[in-house]
Amino acid sequence: MISGWDKALLFFSTIVPSKYDHVWFIEDDVFFLNEQVLTNLDLKYPNQDLIANCDFDKNNVNTTNVNSTNVGWVWPLISIKIEKPWYAGMMCAARLSNTLLQCIRWYASKYNTLFFLEALFPTITSHFKLSYINPIELTTVTYRDVFFLEEEEEEEEEDQKRLETYIFHPMKDLNKHLELRANK
């Protein structure tokens, strides 16, 4: 089955392969206050190949056999055709360089497949020795969290600063996205 992610990767790596130096990929349940959040990250990390919530921690990497459940993750369900180590992270909001996109294109062309994107982006980044950053602004891109933004409590100054500079996942209520943007 071809996913929206597959189509987006094909578009930016093959159809318009040199139009952009970097591309942000963002799922619909990701919240950020405005485009300035992304612009600030672009300015802060202009040369990174991967910006995402992935720490490349050696304790969370799959270096053992493919059937390992390693840290309780889904490694047994993923078929990766390149040598280890394999990494994983939250890719719901990630910026990829054209260089990384071309490496993903190479993998897709060579093996006629891709794999689970939460492992694909960081594993390809590591395999090709590309640059990456796990900025504090993306530490709120998580699997399942409830953020202060979704609660009815009084905002504190620190919360306001985070709202203006961080990216949040998941925020499933898209009406809350609109409400937060309208109130700022």
Residue ranges and their predicted role:
Residues 31-126, 178:
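Conserved catalytic core of nucleotide-sugar-dependent glycosyltransferases
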